Structure formats: structure tokens, C-alpha cells
Amino acid sequence: MLRQVLHRGLRTCFSRLGHFIASHPVFFASAPVLISILLGASFSRYQVEESVEHLLAPQHSLAKIERNLVNSLFPVNRSKHRLYSDLQTPGRYGRVIVTSFQKANMLDQHHTDLILKLHAAVTKIQVPRPGFNYTFAHICILNNDKTCIVDDIVHVLEELKNARATNRTNFAITYPITHLKDGRAVYNGHQLGGVTVHSKDRVKSAEAIQLTYYLQSINSLNDMVAERWESSFCDTVRLFQKSNSKVKMYPYTSSSLREDFQKTSRVSERYLVTSLILVVTMAILCCSMQDCVRSKPWLGLLGLVTISLATLTAAGIINLTGGKYNSTFLGVPFVMLGHGLYGTFEMLSSWRKTREDQHVKERTAAVYADSMLSFSLTTAMYLVTFGIGASPFTNIEAARIFCCNSCIAIFFNYLYVLSFYGSSLVFTGYIENNYQHSIFCRKVPKPEALQEKPAWYRFLLTARFSEDTAEGEEANTYESHLLVCFLKRYYCDWITNTYVKPFVVLFYLIYISFALMGYLQVSEGSDLSNIVATATQTIEYTTAQQKYFSNYSPVIGFYIYESIEYWNTSVQEDVLEYTKGFVRISWFESYLNYLRKLNVSTGLPKKNFTDMLRNSFLKAPQFSHFQEDIIFSKKYNDEVDVVASRMFLVAKTMETNREELYDLLETLRRLSVTSKVKFIVFNPSFVYMDRYASSLGAPLHNSCISALFLLFFSAFLVADSLINVWITLTVVSVEFGVIGFMTLWKVELDCISVLCLIYGINYTIDNCAPMLSTFVLGKDFTRTKWVKNALEVHGVAILQSYLCYIVGLIPLAAVPSNLTCTLFRCLFLIAFVTFFHCFAILPVILTFLPPSKKKRKEKKNPENREEIECVEMVDIDSTRVVDQITTV
């Protein structure tokens, strides 16, 4: 009883609101436009988010704490040449992969000379500034001897060239660790790619060579010069490529990922304009009909204007509050399109059910009472789900900002639909009541006055006048609309046909089977190349890097951050055990081998162990570079102690798999907790992948929970709680199918796809809730009759919004960007699967599942029978229209 009272009370409130808006249409039409112009004007000076890490790396993660600890001991900016990572290397740098089209050996004489010429050209790059020209020597990272740090492969190639010049045949390159002429052992696993080896790891050939040039960025001037040097670096590599057409070069810099991420917005512009034109055309066609008076083409256009005003207002507010633009915002207009269009088409559908002899104010009040309650509840669902996503519980900034922007846009869209679109409906209502042309707004003459006009003129002015319409035909004046006619006369009878139902059920079982198959293969996508435009430096470099340099993982720093008994043999065994199985670049292991070669026991007393380490081992030229890996401290009694040290580990992998690397990280972390030696592991890529899975799923998980809670509490606002049960089951079915099919379509579970899944919850409720409500609340008659009625009442609005949404998505498929490709596939699946449920699954399943309907009992008395039929006809359509009843 309470639910019915609340339901009727809300309908009455919306009816009065509609009457009030119809009484002041000019104010409610102009106010949203003025607000949008004032707030949207600030968007002309929008700022672009520059930091990809800020957007896509989890905000709160253990890796960031570990990075701070590592930085306090061994600054990462100076160590980045040791901590190799493909796309996440910190600071400024330029990198190039050199390979051959014919898969030639890059270590032969010709290619060796070519690469050394490229190296010389890169080091001579000049960045002009007022009064000074900066070269690589001015902005490079310096070694202890004040020389620029360059990749060890450059020294290897120089030694190889000298060996050939002097006809020395004893020079050999080993892989993945080789020795230079000064005795240093260096790791070359990420500098030589596509390697073929002889016995004892001697390199026979290499298909690719990678060079990296690390730059300083210690202040703003230095950073600006380094950024310009990176741009000149790419230009130099391209010019070198043109003059040496037999080799292929893949340049990459620290700015490439950011620029290619932002490039998505630029390459999407003309496709979005095409999408807008198609949506406008389809919306106008969906609102048009042959009757030139009752046709509403302007409402189709004004519905899109309403959505545009809300989006512009939200963008202005985000900009005024200090928000910055990023390419993920491309999905916001499509979120608005799915929600806003259905609301406007539902209002138009309700308008068609009102009586034409009523005043416009009364018709508008009836429209608001009929459609605004469901639209308000679905809007509340959007606000709650996206609001949870915009909360601090969301650990990925890109997802949080997207949800925040969507929340603001949806809120203003709701207000503008109530005001701007409602007043537009009032204006078109007056045009209709005055029998004016729906496009040209001129009085339409009666058919008698058009007899002498040309056929095309009579066609343009086709209209039905009330005095020419029989009383019983008044409710059918809108049935000349193509979609209304299609649903009422053909589709409703076909989908509820007894012979069609088994095929639909079979098709649904196939749908569930394929969805389950895809669901079991869901993979998490933390690859940053999935968010950038295609045919860019990032994509080309990543493809080459995975092809030639995926044999080994990124270099993992192994940091012992407290003083331990390095001289103790049991501690030595523990440290060696922890690093066993990795390719190691370790001062500790080298020092122990050094002692063994001198026939000195590794279990020396502490003082002897430390003195020999400082005064003998680190003084040797081949081991002097290890000085950066050890931190000594003097105690009060002048005793020297090793307070912290680091080693570098590389894991052998068949392929650089993010999940495999994350599992390795978690394994090492668990080991650090239980081990006697206190250590941490770090690589810059860990900042992006640490807790990525939980951070990624949190917005979707929280949104699902909030949606369930809202459905539970909204059961008190709807007339029957069974509506919410059906909505929940439908949402589960749709989301399950979308996740499964997007996996089969090679879409990983990343930031973009998770945001689309959150939107999918709301899109499903948006389209299915009104239809389910009409079915569940129906009294008497059969389930089949009420399924047909629900489709007739709400099917047109669903079909209209679906057609507009799909034509708007189609141009998105052609955008040359991985981000928009993911966006298109997810949104298309959401729209298609929801449409499949609305027009196939639900109409069939509802015919044999609860709630049951009481069959009408026919009365023997003809007078009673006529009265009962009149009442039932009113209940079926739940409108103010009563068809002519003939009972004889």
C-alpha cells in the first residue's frame, strides 16, 4: 500500500512540474542555454593532463612507497640506465631500435659501422638556445669520471670494430652478459635482440640492436632543453633512416607515450563530427512521420542539443574546478547519448499517447507524470554508480575523473531534459494544436484546398484533421509512424508466436555458452600501448621491442636496505639463494668470486671483509662501477659498515607478459616478508602494474554493489518489488554476456573497458526498466497480451534510441586508435546485447515466467461485459486514451 501511495504521489508531483514548465516555456528554454554558455566558455582555455603515470598508475600502491625508499638510497634518476624498463623509464631519454628488413646480422661490419655513425650523429645533436647551443654532452647523465653514460653495447661495437681493424679473432660477445676490454661484466639482454648463440653463450648473430641515451632533467631549463633534444633525436633518426633505406629504425622518447595518448583526441575529431551528423540525421528521421502536423523532427534535433548543452556545462565546471582534459573523456558524449536520447524519446512516446483535444499544458503534465518517474530513477542509478566511481575509493585517476565528469554531465542532462527539452515539447505542442507544419511552422491547409496542387506539394502537406477523424480513430493518429506500425502490426505478434519461442530460447542458450567461454578467458590489460593512437612511435616501438627483446624481463633492482652480516657464510648463502635463477649483475657475487680467485675465504671477519671490499675490490678497474651499488657508514669507533646495497636481477621469460611479471613481483615480495634479509625489489614498471587488478576492478565492484543497494531501496518507490528482481537478473545477464563477448573480441579488462561496463549497468536499466514495469504492473489478461503491450508502449523509444546510438558508434570504429577501438567494441556490445534482451529474450521469457496474470472472467450479462471491457482497456495501456469498444 505504501508503495502505491509513493508511486502516485511522485506521479502527481511530476504532473504539476510539467504543468508549471508548460506555463513558463520561454524561461525554461532560455535558462539552460545561458548557463551552458557561461560555464562552457571557460572550456576554451582547457588544460591537458601531461602525466600518464598520474592518470593510469594506481594512486596508492606499495610500489610508490618502495620507489620513495629506493630514491632515498639510490636515486632512480641516476640509476635509470641500470633499471631498464620499456615504456616506464623515468626522466628524459631517447631510445632507438635498429634492425634490418632482410633480417641481416646487425653485428656484421657494415651494420656495425652504420650504428656507430648513428651514435655519432646523435651525440652531435644541437639544441639552440639564446647565447648557447646544447649538445648531448651538456645534458647527459655523467659517470663518476665526468663522462657521459652511454649504453655498454656502444663500447662492445667499438671493440668489435677495432678487433676487425687489427684482424683479431679472439674477440667474442657473449649473451646475456658479456665482458668489456676493461674487464667489466655488463648485461646486454636489452641491447641485443633476436640473438642466435653458439656454444657457451657466444653470439653468432643479432637481428636488432637497441641504443638508449639518458638525459638530465634536474630543473625547468634542463627539462625544456631535454624535451627539445628528444624531438631533434626523432628527427635525426628519421633522416638517418631515409639515407639508409635497408635498415629500419624505431625511435622512442620519454614524451612519445604522452604525445601518442593525446593524439587520440586529435585523430578522433573528424570522426566525431561524422558521428554527430549521422546521429542528428537519424534522430530527425526517428521523430518524423508522414503526417506533417504530428511529425516532430525538431524534437529529434533539440534532444541532441539538450545532451550537448549538458556536456558543455559539465566540461566548463570540470575546467573551472581545476580539472584537466585527457583522451578518456571521448567516452563521455556516448554515455550521455545513451541516457539522454532514451529519455527524450520516451517523453515523445508519452506525448503520442495523450489526447489531442487536451490543452498543451494538460498534455505536458500527462507526459511528465507518465515518463519522468522512470527517467528519474534511472538517472539516480547513473549518479550513484558513477558517483561511487568518482569517490576516493577509486585508485586509478583516469577512471575517477571520467566518473566525476559523467556524474556532472548526467545531472545537468536530467535538469535540461526537464526544462529545455520539456519546454521544446511545449512549443512543438502548440504548433501541432494550431495545425502548423512541423518543419516550416506554417498553417497547413485542408485537403480540399490542395486538390489543384502538384502531387509532391500534397505529399509534403499530408495531415489528418480532427474533424475528419472519427471518434474511435483518435488513438490511431500516430500509427502512421513507421516504427509504431512495425511493432504493433508485425513484430509483437511474431516474437510471441509459439513457434518462434523455442528458437529464441535456443539462441539464448548459445549466447550464454559463448559468453561463458569468453568469461573464463578474461585477461587484465595493463599494457600502456592499448591507450594510444595506432601508427605511432609507441606502437611501432612496442611491437619491435616485444619481437626482439622479450626474452628477458625488465631489470629488477634488489635492494637490501638495512645492515646485514655480509661476512657471515649463512647470510651469504641466503642472499645467493634469493637471487638464484635470475641473470644477476651483483657486486656481492662478484666480490665473493674475487675472494675465491685470491684463495681467500669468503667468511672473513667483519673488519677484514669490509676493508678488502673498500680498498681492494672496489679499487680494481673492472669492479669500480660497483661503488654506486654500496652505501658505507662510519660508526662512532671509526668502524665501517655496509648499511645498504643493491643488485640487479633479470628473469628469463618466453615473452614479456605483464601478468607473469606481476606474479614474479608478488613472489619476491612474499619472500622479502619471510626472509632473514630485509630487502625490497623495484622497477619503474611496477608503479603501473602494482595492485592494478584490484585497483581496476574496484570501480566496477563498488558500482555493482551500489546498484544492487539502490535497486533494493527503490523497491519502496515502485509499485511492485518484482520489477527490481527482473531488472537485476537482466543486468546480470547483459553484463555477463558483454564481458564474455568482449574477451572473445580481444578486448582486455583495462581502464576503458571497466568504465564501459559501469555504463553498461545503467544502459541496461535505462532501456529495460520501463518495459518490465509495464509488464509486471499489468492486471488481468495473459502474459502474452502484456508483453505485447509493453513492447508497444516502450519499444518505439528503445528502438529509436538504439538506432541513433548505433549510427553514432559506427564512425568510432574507424578511428586509428587503440583507445577508441576498445571504446567502440565495448559500447557496441553493450548496446547490441541490451537490444537483444529487450526485443527477444525478455518478450519470450516473460510469457512463461512470473508474475502470473489472472485471466479475465467473461460475464454472462452483456451490459456488465461491456462495462468490464471498458475498464480493462484503460488498464492495459495505462494511458488516458480509451479506444472505441464494440461488443456486439
Curated annotation (Swiss-Prot):
Gene Ontology CC annotation, any one: dendritic spine
Entry keywords, A to Z: Autism, Autism spectrum disorder, Cell membrane, Cell projection, Disease variant, Glycoprotein, Membrane, Synapse, Transmembrane, Transmembrane helix
Outcome when changing L73F: No effect on localization to cell membrane; no effect on localization to dendritic spine
Bilayer topology term: Multi-pass membrane protein
Domain SSD: 268-427
Substitution effect: V195I: No effect on localization to cell membrane; no effect on localization to dendritic spine
Impact when changing E479G: No effect on localization to cell membrane
Claim: Transmembrane helix is one of the keywords in the record: yes
PROSITE patterns for this protein: SSD
Pfam families: Patched (PF02460)
Transmembrane stretches, start-end: 20-40, 273-293, 298-318, 328-348, 373-393, 407-427, 502-522, 707-727, 738-758, 795-815, 826-846
UniProt subcellular location: Cell membrane; Cell projection, Dendritic spine
Organs and tissues of expression: Widely expressed, including in various regions of the brain with highest expression in the gray and white cerebellum, followed by the cerebellar vermis and the pituitary gland.
Sites carrying sugar chains: N77, N133, N167, N319, N326, N568, N599, N608, N762, N818
Gene3D superfamilies per the UniProt record, alphabetical: Multidrug efflux transporter AcrB transmembrane domain
A Gene Ontology biological process term: excitatory chemical synaptic transmission
Result for mutant: G300R: Found in a patient with a neurodevelopmental disorder; uncertain significance; decreased localization to cell membrane
Family: Belongs to the patched family.
Disease: Autism, X-linked 4: A complex multifactorial, pervasive developmental disorder characterized by impairments in reciprocal social interaction and communication, restricted and stereotyped patterns of interests and activities, and the presence of developmental abnormalities by 3 years of age. Most individuals with autism also manifest moderate intellectual disability.
Function, as annotated: Required for the development and function of the thalamic reticular nucleus (TRN), a part of the thalamus that is critical for thalamocortical transmission, generation of sleep rhythms, sensorimotor processing and attention. Can bind cholesterol in vitro.
Record-given protein name: Patched domain-containing protein 1
Gene that this sequence comes from: PTCHD1
